[in-house]
Amino acid sequence: MAGRWNLEGCTALVTGGSRGIGYGIVEELANLGASVYTCSRNQKELDECLTQWRSKGFNVEASVCDLSSRSEREEFMKTVSNHFHGKLNILVNNAGIVIYKEAKDYTMEDYSHIMSINFEAAYHLSVLAHPFLKASERGNVVFISSISGASALPYEAVYGATKGAMDQLTRCLAFEWAKDNIRVNGVGPGVIATSMVEMTIQDPEQKENLDKLIDRCALRRMGEPKELAAVVAFLCFPAASYVTGQIIYVDGGFMANGGF
């Protein structure tokens, strides 16, 4: 089993691991010795990622799952449980989407879609994983939240609501599951350099909003996925055994500056 500052012998599930923040988290945990399972909606992306990870000697497996589907989530968790023989040390609820619109312009289909992936899937997978986390005798859940969960940002009312709900779920589960030796924490990214951000800044108005966010950061730059992944890994280390119910912001100092 792992020492204080590594994850040797640990099992980990990271949702949405084929790109961006999720990809960075998979690499970080695997590099620290964990056996990792991940998922994506795109088989081709997963195959390309698996080739890269295996060339680096990482122990990673993956399968396709549409996390907006309750039945697929249930089948996926059965697959993960079988792969790890019923014991899971780490669950990182990373998968999420954002739809940039004013709240009044959201359709109910938009609302249902973003809620189902960002909040319902994270909650449901956590509940499905609970017996396997408990069986490991040292479980960790990490929710990937956002500065949007605690700060009002343009065009992110519903996205921010999903992350605010996630933050409260983090605190509640930390108390409910402590008796099962499961710690629950959240990591709130600021602006992280991912393909999603690259697509967003193609819109001049969105680029202007993004530049304003970066200007409010103490470090005056975007973060890298590996910088966020390092904090996720820390929360999973045995050395972090007294940390639970916390939301840690990896935002270059944005929240320290009073938000937007």
Curated annotation (Swiss-Prot):
Pfam families: adh_short_C2. The keyword Zinc-finger does not apply. Its EC number is 1.1.1.236. The keyword Ligase does not apply. GO terms for molecular function: tropinone reductase activity. Pathway: Alkaloid biosynthesis; tropane alkaloid biosynthesis. It catalyses: pseudotropine + NADP(+) = tropinone + NADPH + H(+). It comes from the Eukaryota. The active site is at Y159 (proton acceptor). Substrate binds at S146. Keywords: NADP, Oxidoreductase. One of its GO terms (biological process) is tropane alkaloid biosynthetic process. Gene3D superfamilies: NAD(P)-binding Rossmann-like Domain. NADP(+) binds at residues 13-37. Catalyzes the stereospecific reduction of tropinone to pseudotropine. PANTHER family: TROPINONE REDUCTASE (PTHR42898), TROPINONE REDUCTASE II (PTHR42898:SF55). Belongs to the short-chain dehydrogenases/reductases (SDR) family. This is Tropinone reductase 2. The gene is TR2.
